[in-house]
Curated annotation (Swiss-Prot):
It is an enzyme of class 5 (isomerase). Belongs to the LacAB/RpiB family. PANTHER family: DNA DAMAGE-REPAIR_TOLERATION PROTEIN DRT102, RIBOSE-5-PHOSPHATE ISOMERASE B. Pathway: Carbohydrate metabolism; D-galactose 6-phosphate degradation; D-tagatose 6-phosphate from D-galactose 6-phosphate: step 1/1. This is Galactose-6-phosphate isomerase subunit LacB. Its EC number is 5.3.1.26. InterPro entries: LacB, RpiB_LacA_LacB, RpiB_LacA_LacB_sf. GO terms for molecular function: galactose-6-phosphate isomerase activity; ribose-5-phosphate isomerase activity. Heteromultimeric protein consisting of LacA and LacB. It comes from Staphylococcus epidermidis (strain ATCC 35984 / DSM 28319 / BCRC 17069 / CCUG 31568 / BM 3577 / RP62A).
């Protein structure tokens, strides 16, 4: 399976461990960054993971930031993406089996690597169980999406990166 993975600078080490774990399980990993500990902004990588999944280049996605909240919100803004921020096995399985989630997100400072490995493995193995009710619910959720042409611009976040580089944001 092809899995896109992305993170911000706070949890690059965790992302690298998850990536290695996925590769050891036989998955092809599409690493969209970040690749080091240089300050960056999590929405960039949530968007990149979401785009890989929405385009079909990746089957599923994994997003990691400090808490998981910011990066999951960014990924969820990509049309066609259903991201689940999970902190337990039940939520991970429910999101995939009932809501057909295609991206799973974590807080790398909240959950340990081995726990993340277990949840990612379960999420990948879980299968969507379509019912008339959940298909209608997913259709309603998908209807909420509005495509924004500005999102296709690769420089969409540049103004925030400039502020970040000037030290205007803090961890």
């Amino acid at each position: 399976m092809k899995i896109a993975i992305g993170c911000d600078h706070i949890v690059t080490d965790t992302k690298m461990e998850v990536s290695q774990h996925l590769k050891s399980q036989g998955h092809e990993v599409i690493d969209v960054g970040t690749y080091d500990f240089t300050r960056t902004h999590y929405p960039i990588y949530g968007k990149k993971v979401g785009e890989k999944v929405a385009s079909g280049e990746a089957d599923l996605g994994v997003c990691i930031c400090g808490t998981g909240v910011g990066i999951s919100n960014a990924a969820n803004k990509v049309p066609g993406v259903r991201t689940a921020l999970v902190r337990d096995m039940t939520s991970a399985l429910y999101s995939k089996e009932e809501l057909n989630a295609n991206v799973v997100s974590f807080g790398g400072k909240v959950a340990g690597e081995l726990f993340i490995f277990d949840i990612v493995d379960a999420f990948i193995e879980a299968e969507y169980k379509p019912t008339e009710e959940n298909k209608k619910l997913i259709a309603k959720i998908n209807h909420l999406e509005a495509h924004n042409n500005d999102q296709a611009d690769p420089h969409f976040f540049d103004e925030f990166l400039e502020k970040w580089n000037k030290g205007e944001y803090h961890d």
